[in-house]
Regions:
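C-terminal soluble interaction/assembly domains
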Residues: 157-171
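Aromatic/hydrophobic pocket-lining residues that form the small-molecule binding cavity
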Residues: 52, 56, 100-104, 160
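Aromatic- and acid-rich polysaccharide-binding/catalytic face
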Residues: 117-122, 126-159
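Glycine-rich tight-turn/loop motif centered on a GG-T
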Residues: 84-98
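Aromatic-lined carbohydrate-recognition surfaces of secreted/lumenal glycan-active proteins
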Residues: 3-11, 71-75, 94-132, 171
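Generic structural signal for hydrophobic
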Residues: 56, 63, 136-139, 166
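Active-site-adjacent "subsite" loops/lids of carbohydrate-active enzymes
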Residues: 10-61
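Active-site groove signature of glycoside hydrolases
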Residues: 44-85
Length: 171
């Protein structure tokens, strides 16, 4: 089955094209970058932006119109760099995990019955919890989870059981 893969919030092209969908610097009119500009830093789409969530939904619809019935969404997360200079605009009082869960629920509802959405996360984001997702990716309400295990990392029986238990506990 052909699967389309989309980078979601880590989309520097869309962030530059429509600054209203991007993370900004607090108190400035500049786009926030995940590294120094001289080191190739890139802007990200803002998970709190309704416009960004709609835009991503429109991208899913576009790949669906190309004939893809399965879409893998990666980078459904916040940037790992947290320096207090990021301006997410109005958060509505939602934490990171709650916001990502709401974004995921919106896409799942929009494409229910027409596209199977898969969400890709690293092993660490699933088992250890991460600031990029506001906890464990298993708490986001994801129905179809793809777990990326680093090629150099072998999983012993204990690690395999921990992953199995984490995934089982999340439903």
């Amino acid at each position: 089955v052909p699967v389309a893969k989309l980078a979601v919030f880590r989309d520097p092209i869309a962030a530059r094209a429509d600054r209203n969908m991007a993370i900004g610097y607090t108190g400035q009119a500049y786009l926030w970058l995940d590294n120094k500009a001289s080191a190739g830093g890139n802007p990200w789409l803002n998970p709190y932006s309704d416009e960004a969530v709609r835009f991503i939904g429109d991208l899913i619809g576009e790949v669906q119109s190309m004939g893809f019935d399965h879409v893998l969404l990666e980078n459904v997360q916040f940037p790992s760099a947290q320096n207090g200079k990021q301006d997410f605009g109005s958060t509505g009082g939602r934490g990171r995990s709650a916001q990502l869960a709401a974004d995921i629920a919106a896409w799942d509802a929009r494409f229910e019955g027409s596209v199977t959405l898969w969400y890709g996360y690293s092993l660490g984001q699933v088992t250890d919890g991460a600031s990029t997702v506001g906890g464990s990716a298993t708490a986001l309400g994801v129905r179809n989870l793809v777990v990326e295990v680093p090629a150099k990392q072998t999983m012993d029986d204990t690690a395999r059981n921990e992953l199995r238990n984490t995934l089982s506990a999340s439903g």
